[in-house]
Amino acid sequence: MMYKRMTILSVVFMLMFSTLYLRLFVIVQNEEYVSAGKKQGTYTINAGHTNGNIYDRNMNSLVNREYEYYAVINPTPEAAEEILPFIRDKDEYYGSLVYGKPFLCSVTSGKFKSEDITAFKVPVRYGKNSIAHHITGYTANGEGVCGIEYAYNDFLRSAESVNSVTYTVNGYGTALDGIKKDVYNGGEMKSGVVLTIDRYIQAICELAGRNIKKGAITVMDIYSGDILAMASFPDYDLENLDKAVLDEDSPLINRCLYSYGVGSIFKLVTAQAAFEQGLNEDFSYCCTGSVEVDGQIFKCHDLGGHGEQNMTEAMANSCNTYFIELSKHIDNQFFIDTAKRMGFGMSIPLASGMTASGGNLQTLEDLELPAEKANMSFGQGKLLAAPLQVCAFTCAIANEGNYCVPRLVKGITDDKITVSGGEPEKITRVMDRETAFRLQDLMIAAVDKNPDSNARPSNNHAAGKTSTTQTARFDEDGTEICHGWITGFFPLSSPKYAVTVLCEDGGYGNDCAAPVFKEIIERMTNINY
């Protein structure tokens, strides 16, 4: 009996095993099950990434400053209900929801109760309130196109922080219940390029220049050559670059690096050369409003003439004919060499793809023509320079004769603490201290001691020189279109900063550029710079 029962059980087990084997064989041979089996495993969703930062001198980021939220959702009924009020694009959300698989969506909040929702706070490369566009540049298709984004493209793109969520899924891509998801948060991006720019001074300049239709503002540290701000106008909208390309005002040009006629600012170089050739402030000349040079008539802006004046008075009055006369006593080669020492005619490389134009400086052959030398004496004719060049030579005057090569990049950082690989400061003496002090006095007379100057700040003291540069272009009323300039330094008690403002096609320097210069100094003084 026992044997018979064992035989029956054995037969039953064999039948059950055979049935199971046949069932497994059918499953294995079924293409749908084979395909589903191959898909089983893990499924990772990336939820935003961050590339290397671009920092100012104080490690304040100029990019990645604003944030948006992304959520990865495993679409259970409870999770789908909780996240719905915070969805930015509901059409896209519903389109993904129908598949029942985990997916990524843009949301307005980063806080959710459901375990099936994982939210991330992701930096926006360029937010609505971003600044310094002409310095940072922009990207397209994940690559830097211009500015620092282009110059340091490989480094910035190699530094990447990525957020992700990984699920264990079945053959149809649906998250398996009871198996914990893996969440990876890329964390704060610390690697980046460190600039000499001061974010707050840059913001002040962009605010002060809000009414400049076309132009540029540059601020430098006179002791190091560090560029603290470089604002170009008009700015452009990073979300609408096609419009910027077609804009007749060319907003994509960085006008701080572009060359223009300099005008009366160059009278400081003429004065410097005169000092170094033995002339002094007592050199006098009677301005009658115009003067003839080699058959060409040169007019002063005061057609009635300034009368008898010395160099200090001529600088304050910006008398063209005085400096034409002064230049006659300067050796031609020495005149050119003096301008070169002050950076005129020399380009200024800042980073790959970012170089201030060398402009144009008259040659020795040019100055053999008396009329061309007359033009150069007050910054007209063939003479061209970029606002950054003008700011750099202003630094040399304020820094007692030491010329600092402008610098934009301090280096790179991997930890937001240490900086390496930057260009060192380059400082050269270009005039003696006495000459620098005498030029400072001329600039003080032109602004701080000039009641007609619109550049005098109400809460500080500054020195400077304005320019109104002729362009030989005229408006519909026949009035000549001019560029307005001012360059100067402050505070007088202990000079620290040089400021240069250009208003392209803006008119008289004292009318368009000087008030901007004044506002910048007042705002910087208010925040104790």
Please give the residue ranges for each predicted region.
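Short extracytoplasmic
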Residues: 44-67
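Short pre-catalytic segments that frame enzyme active sites
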Residues: 30-44, 64-67, 72-81, 177-189, ...
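Beta-lactam-recognizing serine transpeptidase/beta-lactamase-like catalytic domain environment
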Residues: 61-63, 222-264, 269-505, 509, ...
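Small/polar-residue-rich segments within soluble enzyme cores
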Residues: 65, 85-190, 501
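Hydrophobic alpha-helical segments, especially N-terminal targeting/anchoring helices
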Residues: 48, 55-56, 156-163, 167-169, ...
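Hydrophobic alpha-helical transmembrane signal-anchor segments
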Residues: 1-31
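Short loop/turn microsegments at loop-to-beta-strand junctions
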Residues: 49-51, 214-217, 458
